[in-house]
Amino acid sequence: MDLKDITIKADGKWYYGNAEMFRRNILNILASHIERDENGAYLIRLGDDVNPITVEDVPFLATGYQETDDGIKLRFHDLQELLLDHELKLTLKGDVPYISYKWEADTRLSRGIYWKLSDYFDFRGDEIYIVPPDVKKG
């Protein structure tokens, strides 16, 4: 498999050539190895093998939400998870919401997740922060 033929579409779906990649366990492995180069381009590094990939918008899409004893957990399309045990800045590009996972504004929130998190919005001037329960406001 030549990884340079991988594209992450704006809707968060992964493609190899024209075929959608739907095996989440494989997506999880690939997504957990995404890096950025000095020019901001995305690549997947597996051992010594480094392959550029095409990302139409951002590499991550939050699609799942779970309240746990440890806090709120977001699950991504690729099965990665982010525990919201700290406040996060919400970035709006037009009407599309983003949060930062590995890099600034690299994760798009699905509409449903955005609305679930809206209970925890803290408006600070022109900025919006997500402050989960039991987290002190900064």
Which residue stretches match the model-derived regions?
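Terminal leader/tail segments of proteins
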Residues: 1-138
